[in-house]
Amino acid sequence: MLKKRKYIWTVVILMAGLSAFLLILYEKKDRLEQSSYELEGAFPNLTFVQPVDLQHSPDGTDRLFVVEQQGMIHAFLNAPETKEMHVFLDIRDEVFMGDSEEGLLGLAFHPRYKENGYFYVDYVANNPRRTVIARFQRSPDDSDKADRSSKLVILEVEQPYSNHNGGQIVFGPDGCLYIALGDGGSGGDPHNHGQDVSTLLGSILRIDVDHPSPGKKYSVPPDNPFSGHHVGAAEEIYAYGLRNPWRFSFDPVTGRLWAADVGQDKPIEEIDIIEEGKNYGWNIMEGSSCFKPPLGCNKKGLTLPIWEYTRDKGRCITGGFVYRGSRLPELAGSYIYGDFISGRLWKLTYDGRHPAVNELLLHNPDLYPSSFGVDENQELYICSFDGRIYRLKEAKD
């Protein structure tokens, strides 16, 4: 997901012990659009190093957890005045960051975290380069600290290139763990992973981590679309034909799975409603346009996005959430998302019956929306890659 900001960019690598920090400096030449919302610092006393995910623990403690790409997770109390955060997990020595799209990318708490203390992470490791889904457990002595010795590797998927790793992991309303994997990288999906259901790449997976099969750390739900009756197909696949679904989320009211898929060189950035067994087109199509071949492609059996935009609005979509909080009632039921490169945030209204309606909320060239998150009350937060966590407020007249 974390494409380099354009049009003028400089990359500086700072080596500090085992850590490598990639700082992307840029200058954009873009017309500033009028915004109906503004940013405000959610936790003005806290800063982070390249935050890429924000989650809350489902244990009633009203804590938030911010994932730093370098390999650390910080825990802190969800209060604007908070000044203290705790290192919940530090796996920088295991995380590989050879490219700006690698690192520690995702965090998911088990639905019964309060009882079992389990949480899961998605990161890139090296030798061989691979995506790792691992489980850890909360320390029995300190709820603000994880027990590193509890690590259990659930799944590993080899990555042929450094980019398009996906990174989001989410427990669905059914209790299964959903995992986003990009097409394996390079450009244009040279190995056609998006349309190859024998590989896990280019897909969203669905696995059961509570009832592992013999010899595995998970099982495949019997109602997965390729479970048990498709020779050669990877049974873990829930949906496929995706390029790099960096961020996805479930609407807690409707149960819909919303995914934002980062585009190629056209580029077309797209939003999909992910459904079981559906093929979302990549690399036959990019969004609603033919990609391979560029003209006259066969669209039969492909599911097109509910919304897309092109390079005049941004070049790297960051998926968000359907807003179900109470602070901003005018956003209720709308999908809030953004673009990492242009600094735009939008709301998308879609009921499944009528065409989606999109509206600009904010255009801030100083915002780097790498991810979104929600707290226990479904209030929305925005992770900016420059180290700050924001929330929205209505713009002053």
Which positions does each model-derived feature cover?
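N-terminal Sec-pathway targeting helices
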Residues: 1-14
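Short, conserved, GDST-rich strand-edge loop motifs in beta-rich repeat architectures
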Residues: 180-200, 267-270
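Acidic, Gly/Ser/Thr-rich repeat motifs that build Ca2+-stabilized beta-propeller blades
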Residues: 17, 22-188, 247-259, 264, ...
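Conserved blade-ending motifs and adjacent loop-strand segments that build the rim/top face
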Residues: 242, 354-376
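Surface-exposed loop and turn segments in beta-propeller and other repeat-based domains
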Residues: 86-100, 149-166, 211-238, 282-312
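Beta-propeller blade signature
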Residues: 133-141, 193-209, 273-275
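Beta-strand initiation motifs
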Residues: 32-40, 80-86, 138-152, 213-233, ...
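Acidic, glycine-rich loop-and-beta core segments that form the ion-binding/anion-interacting portion
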Residues: 235-276
